[in-house]
Amino acid sequence: MDSQRNLLVIALLFVSFMIWQAWEQDKNPQPQAQQTTQTTTTAAGSAADQGVPASGQGKLISVKTDVLDLTINTRGGDVEQALLPAYPKELNSTQPFQLLETSSQFIYQAQSGLTGRDGPDNPANGPRPLYNVEKDAYVLAEGQNELQVPMTYTDAAGNTFTKTFVLKRGDYAVNVNYNVQNAGEKPLEISTFGQLKQSITLPPHLDTGSSNFALHTFRGAAYSTPDEKYEKYKFDTIADNENLNISSKGGWVAMLQQYFATAWIPHNDGTNNFYTANLGNGIAAIGYKSQPVLVQPGQTGAMNSTLWVGPEIQDKMAAVAPHLDLTVDYGWLWFISQPLFKLLKWIHSFVGNWGFSIIIITFIVRGIMYPLTKAQYTSMAKMRMLQPKIQAMRERLGDDKQRISQEMMALYKAEKVNPLGGCFPLLIQMPIFLALYYMLMGSVELRQAPFALWIHDLSAQDPYYILPILMGVTMFFIQKMSPTTVTDPMQQKIMTFMPVIFTVFFLWFPSGLVLYYIVSNLVTIIQQQLIYRGLEKRGLHSREKKKS
């Protein structure tokens, strides 16, 4: 085996990964949603089986902090819109990214309230509560670190229910506190609930990457329990009415998309019911309902939960709830992507540029892997030295494949050569490459992160395709510098066009990933020269053997 055959192996692994990812996307198509209506009454009404009644019409109030711009409906106190001022919708745009939305085209809401036998959100007790508020707009003032939005409702029996949203400066975690004052003569049985509901199919203006394999990340529901740290739940599974229904102490429920997440984290000592539901009208939901608590006559009961609505910032999410940081979609190689990101973030704290951080981490990774790379080239050099003996053996034994195989194994053993020695380092490099791919696609810190010159977003493709072309050029030079024993005409043709094929593939890949591959190729060129010089001294390499 030689380095050009190794390139072929990399290509096959790479193409196999792309085919697998495309197959995963095709075999789990998102169901086609029916037309959604502008109001949310019909969709939410279908959730009555889960104890979440229809919203109906209420007054919309505005709640703004330095990082959140929320719209809350006084009917039920649901968050119907969430804008993130710190995250532009698009590069160089003045419009903030919208996470939650209630429109004729798309519904994504964070619902919450009090249900149970005596809860005002129980459908059996009538329409959802219409809360009273002191004003229509709440703004976190300069110098203020906390903003409270109290909403009150008094039922026909005189019981008072207060729902207070508590927001803090620079924080995407919103505390939702409930106070229940029992003015009656019987205990009140109350449960809290939190539900996220979303249109299953994205409208055209939001569907920015479902047809592009390079932008494929998970969009759907997820949950966490003490037994299951992180479990995804696909929208199409909910649409097929294969619903979640489990009990858990602690944990959370969430809806995820690339870079952003919404999650409900219940805070109580009892058991919560985690569920998913097909609400009809093309809308899926995931939520929790707490174990009922009793509020005695003349007493006040307190309950609370937390809503995360914002970017997937791992350290902040981990501080809000255990394992909430796992919502960052690093795919099946998360155990490699997470430490890579921590290292990348540490480097960024010194250099202040994500592009230069990628360059530095590339040198670190390739430096750590240098012993394997050296072993790979040494093994390939020994294999090349054995080629004349192997060729003579083939001519001597003719078509006796069994004898050829036996004598080749004996030859490898006698010469202390591992025929797979050139492949093993590749099997290590490929997962690292794919883990970096997932890291770049899943880390919100790299979203719209500039590098230099024309690269203004490392998570997006190069708009002028300069980096992919440079990558192809470096790959071409590696090929030219590598010795080869490939004699099969078909393999020779494949190897000739391999830089072109890879260049085409990388046209749509994130600039940060292409940058990593360019730097990695440059390191390979340097390491090749150093290793070949050492092999020449040992008589295992000759520059005359290079392919011209």
Curated annotation (Swiss-Prot):
Regions that span the bilayer: 6-26, 350-370, 420-440, 458-478, 499-519
Signal peptide: none
Subcellular location: Cell inner membrane
GO cellular component, one term: plasma membrane
Biased composition, class Low complexity, residue ranges: 30-50
Classification via PANTHER family: CYTOCHROME C OXIDASE ASSEMBLY PROTEIN COX18, MITOCHONDRIAL, OXA1
GO biological process annotation, one example: protein insertion into membrane
Entries under Gene3D superfamilies matching the protein: 2.70.98.90
Region annotated Disordered, chain positions: 28-55
Name of the protein described by the UniProt record: Membrane protein insertase YidC
Function: Required for the insertion and/or proper folding and/or complex formation of integral membrane proteins into the membrane. Involved in integration of membrane proteins that insert both dependently and independently of the Sec translocase complex, as well as at least some lipoproteins. Aids folding of multispanning membrane proteins.
Subunit structure and binding partners: Interacts with the Sec translocase complex via SecD. Specifically interacts with transmembrane segments of nascent integral membrane proteins during membrane integration.
Example of a GO MF term: membrane insertase activity
UniProt record similarity statement: Belongs to the OXA1/ALB3/YidC family. Type 1 subfamily.
Primary location group: membrane
Keywords on record: Cell inner membrane, Cell membrane, Chaperone, Membrane, Protein transport, Transmembrane, Transmembrane helix, Transport
Lipid bilayer topology: Multi-pass membrane protein
